[in-house]
Curated annotation (Swiss-Prot):
NCBIfam families: PRK12904.1, secA. Residues 855-912 are annotated as: Disordered. The gene is secA. It is found in: Cell inner membrane; Cytoplasm. This is Protein translocase subunit SecA. CDD domains: DEXDc_SecA, SF2_C_secA. Pfam families: P-loop_SecA, SEC-C, SecA_DEAD, SecA_PP_bind, SecA_SW. Its cofactor is Zn(2+). It catalyses: ATP + H2O + cellular proteinSide 1 = ADP + phosphate + cellular proteinSide 2. The keyword DNA-binding does not apply. It comes from the Bacteria. It comes from Xanthomonas campestris pv. campestris (strain ATCC 33913 / DSM 3586 / NCPPB 528 / LMG 568 / P 25).
Length: 912
């Protein structure tokens, strides 16, 4: 009550910030008459002037009003677009390292030019991050004219571009690209074998377009560079033949072999199903010994394959979660409806789907480098973002990224009408109403955009409209090449466009069609008369569409996130245009079926509703929003949980990448090698001759054998002990150290100091990279099963931190030992041989990168929900870890060895 009273008196925090920024807008507007009088040359001279002032110690905030005024005037002259006052406010919010929520059509692309220009003056690079390559290239081309005119360089990065072009793009003042490409290049840079092979400078300032899509929706999707592992894919094909013989249960307690947890995207075998699966696997020869059973340690790989195959068949649907194109399974983004070429699900899921669809099964991949978008973007010195829908996720932006959301007012009032949801008994009744609404709009000349949640639904609607003779366009993952053309025409009178989720996001739907696209089609040589005719025709269409009610949005299903629904609605009513929206739902929709309260469904059935009967009530809409909030909270927990775990990896990643940077920058690593050699020899001797020990405790024979096998150095320590009666452990350690130092000195004298320095650097880099790659594989295995510790009354996160630290320490010790072993044994005759070694390694590294893949880790799938429930004390189903162990068989009714007190079949012996 007190809070609401204070808000009424002083205004909300958002309103107070806007008032404060409006004072700067007044300053910028006051400068406009002076700036307008400058000649082109004088205006362009402002850029070097600003740079000099910054070099002299002035701050960006100090020059902001004048720099914004210069950028606005330059935009008016070069692009023919002048920034509105609200766009100036948006630019200031971005400069301050916050998120600007701006409605669709408010000119976010133009807004970004203000903070981009200002921050690029520092000369440390500005990254403008977009959701796809098309938008990156489009914005770089359009806005690049402005930046180039002002004396700043612009680059754009995209997959597969030549190395020299990418180096130039990152060296530019302003670089456009996708979140994937920036992240992928960051990982590639940290696999480079020389400083010259790296692209990026230090991550200085980034503006993320559609920031909610990248930092929220894709936060559960780590960037992974992976290469093929050694395991054959044959087992996926054999297990795939088993799964269709298992039967689905209608409920958890019903008859059958497995039941589906749709909320958690998991499949669980029943008791009967476990026995049936064992029987089928034995018949197929996949399990060799009937006495061992499915749960023996040596069969854990089969459990992993069976779990993946069950999920592939029972949960993942063709034309919903993926499409099959050119003999490959291509993932469809659940948020945008776009295909994610090159991405693959992890944990064997992608191979299981390939086996299900009968396409070639590719090998499982081994992680070479990995980072989440959360940790990637938190590395920027300053981060900001813009989107049309951020306020519903304001808490997550603040808690994860430290980014405040500021809602920017629209330039003109929004007049879109958002009608209440219409709820039907089943999908048939719902789609009948959708088709009737579409046909009505088409007859009245009102353009309509229909949002669907899957390719399957979009094609089903398309087929019905085709039969009804309604002309329409379909925009989904299968038509992505025509995306820009379809969106450009979506505002034509009577146009019907069916789009999966937010495909086409980033391009405005203009009432009457895109005038800019028509001008572009005319070409630069078009006469004024031709341009005038096109403008007149467009104005007539524009007015007709406005009179018909503007763009009408139809949602065929509510998304799990309110934000995605708001994005769809936001396509209508841009810049004060008229528009309307309505969602059509049924009790058979996923959200209603899984998450909505049971009373909604019971009430509708008790009222005796028929197929085409409809409920249109604000109370129902509120219940649906309540269900969405539950899902959003659940998904936030998953993302937060992922971040908590990845923060452990991130700390280790920073250490390794910092060491690589030091190695790449160093002229010589001799001091490093000398220090490592001392540590390795001390530890080696201590294993066989413990410090402060007596000779009866020594194992000189074992020490001699190890020195020869690992370092290639025969050393007669037993003879030495016979001839020197007063020899102690410290003297032996000193003798070994002296001998090893002499061995290295001889090697250096033979090949020359320069050759030895080059060899040391090459070996250290190669061994560190190999050790890190193997460590990542161990961390993956640890991560997959760590939450099982919760059943033994242990904190999984604390256990993960402890064991991850132990693994990391072990890896560093192994790297040290391997570096010294290799340097001691390698035989090099000339510097040319070292150069050839480095070149060979570089070629192999490039080949690995070419063969590597950008992998889509479905963190919301295998184990993610169970981890969250386990952290919160829930009783989650337990997947089996993939780590193989040679242990005696445990009976299914025996107590579980983990110490939980449960039977083995209900604990670590349960299949999820």
């Amino acid at each position: 009550m007190i809070n609401s009273l204070l808000t009424r008196v002083f205004g909300s925090r958002n309103e107070r910030q806007l008032r404060q920024l409006n004072r700067l807008v007044t300053q910028i507007n006051a400068l406009e008459p002076t700036i307008e009088k400058l000649s082109d040359a004088e205006l362009q001279a402002k850029t070097p002037e600003f740079k000099q002032r910054l070099a002299a110690g002035e701050s960006l905030d100090k020059i902001l009003p004048e720099a914004f005024a210069v950028c606005r005037e330059a935009s008016r002259r070069v692009l023919g677009m002048r920034h509105y006052d609200v766009q100036l406010i948006g630019g200031m919010v971005l400069h301050l390292g916050k998120i600007a929520e701006m409605r669709t059509g408010e000119g976010k692309t133009l807004v970004a030019t203000l903070p981009v220009y200002l921050n690029a003056l520092e000369g440390q690079g500005v990254h403008v991050v977009t959701v796809n390559d098309y938008l990156a290239r489009r914005d770089a081309a359009q806005m690049g004219k402005l930046y180039n005119w002002l004396g700043l360089s612009v680059g754009v990065v995209y997959p597969g571009m030549p190395h020299s072009d990418k180096h130039a793009a990152y060296a530019a003042d302003i670089t456009y690209g996708t979140n994937n490409e920036f992240g992928f290049d960051y990982l590639r840079d940290n696999m480079a074998l020389s400083r010259a092979d790296r692209y990026q400078r230090k991550l200085h300032y980034a503006i993320v377009d559609e920031v909610d899509s990248i930092l929220i929706d894709e936060a559960r999707t780590p960037l992974i560079i992976s290469g093929p592992a050694d395991e054959s894919p044959e087992l996926y094909i054999r297990v795939n033949r088993i799964v269709p013989q298992l039967t689905k249960q209608e409920s958890e307690e019903g008859e059958g072999d497995y039941w589906i947890d749709e909320k958690g995207k998991q499949v669980h075998l029943s008791e009967a199903g476990m026995g049936h699966a064992e029987e089928l696997l034995l018949q197929a020869g996949i399990l060799e010994n009937a006495d061992d059973g499915l749960y023996a340690a040596q069969n854990l790989s089969v459990v992993h394959h069976l779990n993946a195959a069950l999920r592939a068949h029972a949960i993942y649907q063709r034309d919903v979660d993926y499409i099959v194109r050119d003999g490959e399974v291509v993932i469809v983004d659940e948020f945008t409806g776009r295909t994610l070429s090159g991405r693959r699900w992890s944990d064997g899921l992608h191979q299981a789907v390939e086996a299900k669809e009968g396409v070639p099964v590719q090998r499982e991949n081994q992680t070479l480098a990995s980072i989440t978008f959360q940790n990637l973007f938190r590395m920027y010195k300053k981060l900001s973002g813009m989107t049309g829908t951020a306020d519903t996720e304001a808490y997550e932006f603040q808690s994860i990224y430290g980014l405040e959301v500021v809602v920017i007012p629209t330039n003109r009032p929004t007049v879109r009408k958002d009608h209440p949801d219409q709820v039907f008994l089943n999908r048939k009744g719902k789609f009948n109403a959708v088709l009737a609404d579409i046909e009505d709009c088409a007859k009245r000349g009102q353009p309509v955009l229909v949002g669907t949640t899957s390719i399957e639904t979009s094609e089903m609607l398309s087929e019905h409209l085709r039969k009804a003779g309604v002309k329409h366009e379909v925009l989904n993952a299968k038509q992505h090449e025509r995306e820009a053309t379809i969106v450009a025409n979506a505002g034509q009178p009577g146009a019907v466009t069916i789009a999966t989720n937010m495909a086409g996001r980033g391009t405005d739907i203009v009432l009457g069609g895109s005038l800019e696209a028509e001008y572009h089609a005319l070409g630069e040589d078009a006469t004024e008369e031709a341009r005038f005719k096109i403008k007149t025709d467009w104005q007539r269409r524009h007015d007709a569409v406005k009179a018909a009610g503007g763009l009408h949005i139809i949602g065929t299903e509510r998304h799990e996130s309110r934000r995605i629904d708001n994005q769809l609605r936001g396509r209508a009513g841009r810049q004060g245009d008229p528009g309307s929206s309505r969602f059509y739902l049924s009790l058979e929709d996923n959200l209603m079926r899984i998450f909505a309260s049971d009373w909604v469904q019971k009430a509708m059935r008790m009222m005796g509703m028929k197929e085409d009967d409809v409920i249109e009530d604000r109370l129902v809409s509120r219940q649906i929003e309540k269900a969405q909030r539950k899902v959003e909270a659940h998904n936030f927990d998953i993302r937060k949980n992922l971040l908590d775990f990845d923060d452990v990896n991130n700390d280790q990643r920073k250490v390794i990448y910092a060491q690589r940077d030091d190695l790449l920058d160093a002229e010589s690593v001799k001091d490093n090698v000398d220090g490592i050699r001392g540590d390795v020899i001390y530890d080696l001797v201590a294993r066989f001759v413990p410090p402060n020990s007596v000779d009866e405790q020594w194992d000189l024979q074992g020490l001699e054998a190890t020195l020869e096998s690992e370092l290639g150095m025969p050393l007669a320590l037993r003879e030495l002990a016979k001839t020197q009666e007063e020899l102690d452990a410290e003297q032996i350690a000193a003798k070994v150290q002296t001998a090893v130092d002499a061995h290295f000195a001889e090697k250096e004298a033979a090949v020359g100091a320069d050759t030895m320095r080059a060899l040391e650097k090459h070996v250290m880099l190669t061994v560190l990279d190999q050790g890190w790659k193997e460590h990542l594989a161990k961390m993956d295995y640890l991560r997959q099963g760590i939450y099982l510790r919760g059943y033994a009354q242990k904190q999984p996160k604390q256990e993960y931190k402890k064991e991850a630290f132990e693994l990391f320490s072990e890896m560093l010790e192994n790297v040290k030992r391997e570096v010294i072993n290799l340097l001691a044994r390698v035989r090099i005759r000339s510097e040319e041989e070292v150069a050839e070694l480095e070149e060979q390694e570089r070629r192999q590294a490039e080949a690995r990168l070419l063969a590597s893949q950008f992998q889509h880790q479905d963190a919301g799938g295998y184990g993610a929900d169970e981890e969250v429930e386990q952290m919160q004390g829930g009783n989650a189903p337990v997947p089996v870890s993939q780590v193989t162990r040679d242990e005696p068989k445990v009976g299914r009714n025996d107590p579980c060895p983990c110490g939980s007190g449960k039977k083995y079949k209900h604990c670590h012996g349960q299949l999820s």
